[in-house]
Curated annotation (Swiss-Prot):
Official protein name in the record: DNA mismatch repair protein MutL
Lineage of origin: Bacteria, Pseudomonadati, Myxococcota, Myxococcia, Myxococcales
Gene that produces this protein: mutL
Organism (species): Anaeromyxobacter sp. (strain Fw109-5)
GO molecular function: ATP binding; ATP hydrolysis activity; ATP-dependent DNA damage sensor activity; mismatched DNA binding
Protein family (similarity comment): Belongs to the DNA mismatch repair MutL/HexB family.
Keywords: DNA damage, DNA repair
Length: 601
């Protein structure tokens, strides 16, 4: 068996490069982060052949002295960290001192830098991790780093690189993330001399978000700003009218650092539940701010993942920030009549008459539910929020006309029913309003059911005989921790030994529901986020299903008085844009558009 020996420094750096330098985009990320840590206000990036032939990053930061320039290529040499206490509260983008030596070990590397404007600078060159050579160079204050022929000395790594166009796309995405985090810094990205991205320092947050999300997103952006405990959430999200097929359009930053975090992304997705069609994902740019000692950034080679001291706290802050925006944003809350008592329940009969006991219970609860009283005026859009240290101002496009006036649905003139599925109405000015009768009634019932769950401790309907439910061990522990919340929701559940629980009662509205499957789902949510506040949201799918079964169906006759009651009911709830499954409730066709289509204009 070979004897253990210490590896030579060059090989050590190449091994480190395997973790830090995944592709050209990794080089761009590390070099730009160094520029930002150096106080740069302008960063220029040039790449050729997707960054494999050349990556050049130039900045106007503080620059380095001759001694520091040479020391920067030593492993674990850094100006950003001094002791273990500093590691627990990292405020800079970089801190390990690994990136430059790792990059220099797998490329032809050149660093030009100057700490002052006197033109006296230093050049350091390294080829494939060899011995550095240095000398003077004339240049202005700042630093320029060139990385040529990436992976030229590690052909096994080079052959796994994608086509130049693919690598260029990864580089662009890396720069977009960095530009989103620092609107106070100007960024320029060129590929083979062609301008790919240009963003001036001090650009509006919405403009940079639109660069990342697409120009069409600009008119859908609404600011988010909310605090909960030690966590503050700021940023911009798009309305459900601008959603994506994947989750890649959701940019999450923690203390200014772009991260990938499943729990945080799930919190945002859960807040959007019921507003997006199946398979669609929210888009936005969100910044989570919390004390530095509450987050560990030293858990991933590329610092793309973090570990929170209290993940539940972050999850709840994100969820409530987004959910609060969804309740008040003008593109979702169409207003309600202020100061008046909500109208009575809609007297629509589900298919087959009164329906099951479950449906009857749903309708009974809906009759008891009350929407919150109006404030007497349309809920205003969130105010623009000054960015932290003046670096991120949430300027958004004019939203005039996006919010419907209070009492909008009650003001409609009911015309009739089309295809026994759609309610046709006329709005002021001759606009044709088409309302999906099932989606709208489903939303109305769902909102009232959810209001009952949120505002009251529901009475327990005792069972004649307890039902024993056995769950997987980890799930059972999560359920055990959530028993107080389950009691508030009307469940009488007690431990029954091992991983079993005795269910002695449940809310009357859950008659006929598979309790084991329901408790398994609730436990899974508790296990995921460790938060009792998520239990109500975990019931979303169940409540949506119950409302769906109780609502009037498509291809069902609706009497004029029933249609009128439904319209009045929609004005009594604070959300009516989409059904709980994400389908639109209402569609408008302005008179001018109708006349244009028939040739009158």
């Amino acid at each position: 068996m070979p004897r253990i020996q210490v590896l030579p420094p060059g090989l050590v750096n190449q091994i480190a490069a395997g973790e830090v330098v995944e592709r050209p985009a990794s080089v761009v990320k590390e070099l730009v982060e160094n520029a930002l840590d150096a106080g740069a206000t302008s960063v220029s990036i040039d790449v050729e052949e997707g960054g494999l032939a050349l990556v050049r990053v130039a900045d106007d930061g503080c620059g380095m002295s001759a001694d520091d320039a040479q020391l920067a290529l030593e492993r674990h040499a850094t100006s950003k960290l001094r002791d273990a206490e500093g590691l627990a509260a990292i405020a800079t983008m970089g801190f390990r001192g690994e990136a430059l030596p790792a990059i220099a070990s797998v490329a032809r590397f050149r660093l030009d830098t100057a700490p002052a404007e006197d033109g006296a600078g230093t050049r350091v060159e390294v080829e494939g991790g060899g011995r550095p050579s240095s000398g003077p160079v004339a240049r202005p204050r700042g630093t320029t780093i060139e990385v040529r022929d990436l992976f030229f000395n590690t052909p096994a790594r080079r052959k796994f690189m994608r086509a130049a166009a693919t690598e260029s796309g990864h580089v662009t995405e890396a720069v977009v993330r960095l530009a989103l985090a620092r609107p106070d810094v100007g960024f320029t990205l060129r590929s083979a001399g062609r301008l790919v991205l240009g963003s001036r320092a001090g650009a509006a947050a919405a403009d940079r978000a639109a660069q990342a999300l697409g120009r069409d997103a600009h008119r859908h952006l609404v600011p988010v700003d909310a605090g909960r405990g030690n966590v503050r959430v700021r940023g911009l999200v798009c309305s459900p009218d601008h959603s994506e097929a994947t989750g890649r359009a959701l940019y999450l930053f923690v203390n200014g650092r772009y991260v990938r975090d499943r729990g945080a992304a799930h919190a945002v997705l859960r807040a959007f539940a019921g507003t997006l069609p199946p398979g669609r994902h929210p888009a936005g740019v969100l910044f989570v701010e919390l004390p530095l000692d509450r987050v560990d950034v030293n858990v991933h080679p590329q610092k793309l993942e973090v570990r929170f001291a209290e993940a539940r706290e972050v999850y709840d802050a994100l969820f409530h920030a987004i959910a609060g925006t969804l309740r008040t944003a003008p593109w979702l809350a169409h207003g309600r009549a202020g100061g008046s008592a909500p109208p009575g329940p809609v007297a629509l009969t589900p298919p087959g008459g009164a329906g099951s006991d479950e449906t009857a219970a749903v309708l009974a609860w809906a009759r008891e539910a009350h929407a919150p009283e109006g404030s007497g005026a349309l809920v205003p859009p969130p105010s623009p929020v000054p960015g932290a240290s003046g670096t991120f101002a949430f300027a958004i496009p004019d939203e005039a006309g996006l919010a419907r006036p209070a009492g909008y649905f009650a003001s409609l003139r009911y015309v009739g029913q089309h295809a026994r599925t759609y309610l046709l109405c006329e709005a002021q000015g001759g606009t044709l309003v088409v309302i999906d009768q099932h989606a709208s009634h489903e939303r109305l019932l769902f909102q009232r059911l959810r209001e009952v769950f949120r505002t009251r401790k529901l009475p327990v309907q005792p069972f004649l005989l307890p039902q024993v439910v056995t769950l997987p061990p980890a799930v059972a522990r999560a359920l055990e921790g959530g028993l107080p919340e389950l009691a508030r929701l009307g469940f009488d559940v007690e431990p029954f030994g091992g991983d079993s629980f005795a269910v002695k009662g449940a809310p009357a509205a859950l008659a006929g529901v598979d309790l084991e499957a329901l408790l398994l789902d609730l436990s899974a949510q508790l296990e995921l986020v460790g938060s009792g506040t998520a239990v109500d949201e975990a019931l979303h799918d169940l409540l949506a299903t119950m409302a769906c079964h109780a609502a009037v169906r498509a291809n069902q006759e609706v009497a004029p008085e029933e249609a009128r009651a439904l319209l009045d009911g929609l004005d009594a709830i604070d959300f009516k844009a989409r059904c709980p499954h994400g389908r639109p409730v209402v569609f408008e066709l302005p008179l001018a558009e109708l006349e244009r289509r028939v040739g009158r204009r």
